[in-house]
Amino acid sequence: MQSNLYKRQKEPLLIVISGPSGVGKDSVVKRMRELGLPFHFVVTATSRPQRPHETEGVDYIFVSKDEFGRMIEADELLEHADVYGQQKGIPKEQVREALNSSLDVVMRLDVQGARTIRDLSDDALLIFLVTQNEDELVRRLKERRTESPEALKLRLDMARQEMQGVEELFDYCVVNADSQLDAAVDTIVDIINAEHQRTKPRKVEL
């Protein structure tokens, strides 16, 4: 009798890249895209203004606050949150279509959003990014030059809070050190590959 292992189909993964502001979530996901990895990278909808280096439909889907409210009312978002006064959300149909096509889905979310996804699916794969130390995080946030001193303090206070309870919510913790972006990406890809070898695969249903 043939083993069921030979007949087993690959289950697509729902992968959340999360962590505090300044740990490099955007940089990690951008690098994964550049490498041409065979994943579907979710484009998040946001009501915040577009930054000079960002591309519509690639970095984010930029919408007005009124349009974002309409999307919430129409139940078009898998999760949504108010983050530092700016609304962000994951388009539901985009994720479902990719999973139904057997594609691994990668999304970047803040910790609040990651918690929402965990509530929706115990089998989602949650990866927490960190810097090597807090000094590195402070320097990165300051180098953005997009934060007032008050906003910077708020983000740092929030980061410290988000570091608490990581073990209960996340499956893995990956260090994204300065000048080591590719190493962080390699670690994440190794995690994904290992997850596909599990004898009891994750099965995401949304």
Locate each region found by the language model.
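P-loop (Walker A) phosphate-binding loop of NTP-binding proteins
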Residues: 18-20
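ATP-dependent small-molecule kinase phosphotransfer cores
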Residues: 46-105, 111-112
